[in-house]
Each structure stands twice: as C-alpha cells, then as structure tokens.
C-alpha cells in the first residue's frame, strides 16, 4: 500500500453520468488526500435507497457525473496532513455524515448533527478546497455525501470515518454505515423502549427491520409491524416482529386499530416510511401519558404534519432522529461490537451479494423491491 502514498491512484469506479441511466464502469484518477482527509481502499459496499433516490434525481438538484455510494467498509490507504487518529491499514467505515468533535453539536451529548460535516446532498466536492478528488482525463467527477464508495478508492474527510475492530468482517459490518444503524439507533437511542413494552414499527424495509431489531434487543414483548406489503411479514418475524397490521385490511385508521390491540396504544412507535400519513398514524397510535413516537423516514418536501394539539397535551411525545442519534466516530465502533458480541445479527439483513462489475443488478433488485441489502464485492 505504501507505494501509492502521495500519488494519484487510477482505479475502477462506477460512474453515474446522467439521471436514471445505468452506471458505467470507468477508470478514474483518485488524487491523494489533502489536509484532514483520508484515502480509503473500499472492499465492500452496499446499496441504499438514498443512492437510488439521487441516481433517479427526480426530486432534487441533479449533480452529474457523480460517483454514488455511501454504505461501505474498507481500509485506510493513506492520510493527509493533520490526521493523527487514523493510519494506513486501519479498518474503517466511511459515513455519510460526520463528527468534527469541535462544534457545538459534537460537544453536545444530545446531538449528532455536526455543523461542519452534516450531510449535504448537493455538495459534490471536498469541503477543504471545494475541489473533487476524482477525475477522468482531467475533468472532475463529483462526490456524493462525502463518501462515493462505488469506487475502488475514495477520499473522505477524517470526521466521516469510523475506525473499527480489525477483526470485524467488513462484508457484514459495512451495512452499519447507514441504514441499519439509523433504524437500530432510532429505537435504542431515541425511542428507548423498556423491557416488556410494546413497540409499533411503520415500514418493514431494511431500516424498519433494524428498528425492530432494536426493539428485540431492548426486550420489547410486543413488536407490531405495520406495512402495506403483506409479503414482508414472514421475513419480519426473524427480526422479532410478533404481530402484523396491514392498513389495507381495515376501514378505520390504523392508529385506531393499534389502540384497540394494545388497550389504548403502544408504548413506543418508530416510523420508517417517510409517508406523512404513516407519520401521523405513528404518533397518534402511542399511548397517552407516556407514549413516544420517533420519526425516521424523510417526507416529501411539500408534506405537512397535522394532528390535534390535545394529542400532545395528553402527554404523548413526538421526536425526530437523524442516523439513529449515533455520532459516527464516537459511537459506530460500539455498534460494530454489538455485532461482534452476537447481540446484533447482521447476516439476516444481507440477502444478495454481487461482484462490482454487476453493480447495476443491485439497482435492479432495489427497484423491484427484492431483498434487503445487497453487498457489492469490490475485488474480483
């Protein structure tokens, strides 16, 4: 590895040249890391709905050509000036949001929304100098959420890199750098269900099932899965879900159905769909006096949350969360340890594996709604 330090590395990357078109495998030049940056060799990456959303570019600013990808694991190849806590050979997870450790958010025990490195989906360059580290024939290829893991090598700000246990299998723990931690933390860190409590999970995709896994780990006795797709129910049992509600089966609002099932409402709910009606239902289905609802899904930009103020005055709590309230550098290593201690099971989230050359198949699988996480192996 050391022979490449300070040099431009030419490697393979899957480039999104335009919205909705298949990614193209290209030879890209990856510049050395600058001040407070790290160059990583990506070994495994997985596909998340966020990658597909920005590849389709239907509802936001299109930034192309771009190297997508943000859920991954790899090894540090080299570090830039000022980087002291990471070195070549370290095993790491790059994360789409960061932790500078200096701002008010990073110094707060309550927040993980770093002022410097908070996710910015429009920015396609490094914050240090406003330039891209990727190029083809001298022309820049843009970054994605500071990670761009659909490349054999990438450059990331040090604050967006979590150093993890070198014994952790990178082909499993790579899924912890985004969706699984988001759902898990929403339950464990924000909803905080107690042993024996009831929890409703709205949306049984990968993030929702991770939220259910959090409820299972916390010792919840009833985990009610809510989804319009009945085919997801069987799989959800593996994640601790005990009961299922399909809103299509009822003529009344799902919050009323859940209230009747649970003698007045669940103790906690976690909403993972981003649909505004589900968000309102998730809040209104929690028990008065102590119920807590946590919103995880990202709504449409025109969405408006409407509920009667009495629902709040009757001592229900509504919370939002970002990345499960985990600080990337400080907290994600301990989530990896949950897996290493067999407290958290990751294998059941991984339903497909593909070589890097077949990355477009991973997009097809997600667009068809097949499986949960597809691991893409970077090395042949």
From Swiss-Prot:
Binding residues for NAD(+): 50, 203-208, 227, 232, 273, 296-298, 323, 373
PROSITE patterns xrefs: ADH_ZINC
Pfam family membership, one: ADH_zinc_N
Cysteine pairings via disulfide bonds: none
Alphabetized GO MF terms: alcohol dehydrogenase (NAD+) activity; S-(hydroxymethyl)glutathione dehydrogenase [NAD(P)+] activity; zinc ion binding
Binding-site residues for Zn(2+) 2, renumbered to this chain: 100, 103, 106, 114
UniProt keyword list: Cytoplasm, Metal-binding, NAD, Oxidoreductase, Zinc
CC cofactor note: Binds 2 Zn(2+) ions per subunit.
Enzyme class: oxidoreductase
Binding annotation for an alcohol: 50, 70
Positions annotated to bind Zn(2+) 1: 48, 50, 70, 178
EC number of the protein: 1.1.1.1
Family in the record: Belongs to the zinc-containing alcohol dehydrogenase family.
Subunit structure: Homodimer. Homotetramer.
Protein name, entry field: Alcohol dehydrogenase 1
Gene source species: Solanum tuberosum (Potato)
């Amino acid at each position: 590895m050391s022979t490449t330090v300070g040099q431009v590395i030419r490697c393979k990357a899957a480039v999104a040249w335009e919205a909705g078109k298949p990614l193209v495998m290209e030879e890209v030049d990856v510049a050395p890391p600058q001040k407070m940056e790290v160059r990583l060799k990506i070994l495994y990456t997985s596909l998340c709905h966020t990658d597909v959303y920005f590849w389709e570019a239907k509802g936001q600013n299109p930034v192309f050509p771009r190297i997508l990808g943000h859920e991954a694991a790899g090894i540090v190849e080299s570090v830039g000036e000022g980087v002291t806590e990471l070195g070549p050979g370290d095993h790491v997870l790059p994360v789409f949001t960061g932790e500078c450790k200096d701002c008010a958010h990073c110094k707060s025990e309550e927040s993980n929304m770093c002022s410097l490195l908070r996710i910015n989906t429009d920015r396609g360059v490094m914050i240090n100098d406003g330039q891209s580290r990727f190029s083809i024939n001298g022309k820049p290829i843009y970054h994605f959420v500071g990670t761009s893991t659909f490349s054999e090598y990438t450059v990331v700000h040090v604050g967006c890199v979590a150093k993890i246990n070198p014994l952790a299998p990178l082909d499993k723990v790579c899924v912890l750098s985004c969706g699984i931690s988001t759902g898990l933390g929403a339950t464990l860190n924000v909803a905080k269900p107690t042993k024996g409590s009831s929890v409703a999970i709205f949306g049984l995709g990968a993030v929702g099932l991770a939220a259910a896994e959090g409820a299972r780990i916390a010792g919840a006795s009833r985990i009610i899965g809510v989804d319009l797709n009945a085919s997801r129910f069987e799989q959800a049992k593996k994640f601790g879900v005990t009961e299922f509600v399909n809103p299509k089966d009822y003529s009344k609002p799902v919050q009323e159905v859940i209230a009747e099932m649970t003698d007045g409402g669940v103790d906690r709910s976690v909403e993972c769909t981003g649909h505004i009606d589900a968000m309102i239902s998730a809040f209104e289905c929690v028990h008065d006096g102590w119920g807590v609802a946590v919103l995880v899904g990202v709504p449409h930009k025109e969405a408006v949350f409407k509920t009667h103020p009495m629902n709040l005055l009757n001592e229900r709590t509504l919370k939002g969360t970002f990345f499960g309230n985990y600080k990337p550098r400080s907290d994600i290593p301990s989530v990896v340890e949950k897996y290493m201690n067999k407290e958290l099971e990751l294998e059941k989230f991984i339903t497909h594996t593909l070589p890097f050359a077949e990355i477009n198949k991973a997009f097809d699988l997600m667009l068809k709604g097949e499986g949960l996480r597809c691991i893409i192996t970077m090395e042949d």
